[in-house]
């Protein structure tokens, strides 16, 4: 048994430790690189291109825009719709997680509690699914994003890679497709409608809006008024 430990387990343990260290180093360097370089592609886009769902177009639409070319209303709308404590939390909204757990345990419709940081990590680096491995990697990358990027960069990347409809990636492509409007000129109502489709962009359309999107966008507008521009100032600081 001592010989087995010496010649098998110890070398195997060293290899595993080197692999873990290499993975950590690689992921840190990758996140640092994407802090200053806009990603030419991302995991969610690659999955859609390789395994297109029903209704996916032959060519996708995407155009990267910097934060200063995105309407403040659009930035506020996605915070109001998806993650109202975005500026305050460190990547994980434990209050929202508790509310979602209570809701789900009480027999309500299953509700998630992913923050914008977690959604950015998932769309940028990971595959779809609900396995514990993927959730663990999502948490790891979300932590790295919070440690190595600022909130402004996280929101910018999110708005440039999220899918607003079949093959419509990013807010610039979405604004032009649905409203014929660039991202920097989107109105509050247009922004609210775009944010309203994010739970399921294959089921809902920003224009023409379904009754659900109309109700959801009115709720988002109300939340935007309550949050005010102070939320964006906190993100940009």
Predicted regions and their residues:
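Juxtamembrane regions of bacterial inner-membrane/periplasmic proteins
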Residues: 2-237
């Amino acid at each position: 048994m001592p010989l087995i430990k010496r010649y098998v387990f110890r070398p195997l343990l060293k290899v595993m430790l080197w692999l873990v260290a290499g993975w950590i180093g690689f992921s840190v360097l990758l996140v640092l690189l994407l802090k200053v370089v806009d990603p030419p592609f991302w995991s969610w886009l690659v999955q859609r291109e390789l395994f297109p769902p029903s209704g996916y177009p032959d060519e996708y639409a995407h155009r990267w825009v910097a934060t200063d070319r995105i309407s403040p209303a659009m930035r506020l709308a996605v915070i109001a719709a998806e993650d109202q404590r975005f500026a305050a939390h460190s990547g994980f909204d434990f209050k929202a997680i508790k509310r979602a757990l209570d809701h789900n345990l009480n027999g309500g419709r299953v509700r998630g509690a992913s923050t914008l940081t977690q959604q950015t990590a998932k769309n940028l680096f990971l595959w779809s699914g609900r396995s514990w491995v993927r959730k663990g990697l999502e948490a790891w990358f979300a932590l790295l994003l919070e440690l190595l990027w600022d909130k402004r960069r996280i929101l910018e990347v999110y708005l440039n890679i999220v899918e607003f409809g079949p093959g419509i990636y990013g807010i610039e492509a979405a604004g032009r497709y649905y409203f014929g409007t660039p991202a920097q000129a989107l109105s509050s109502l247009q922004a609210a409608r775009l944010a309203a489709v994010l739970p399921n962009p294959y089921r809902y359309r920003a224009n023409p809006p379904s009754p659900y999107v109309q109700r959801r966008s009115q709720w988002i507008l109300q939340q935007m008024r309550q949050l005010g521009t102070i939320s964006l100032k906190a993100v940009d600081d």
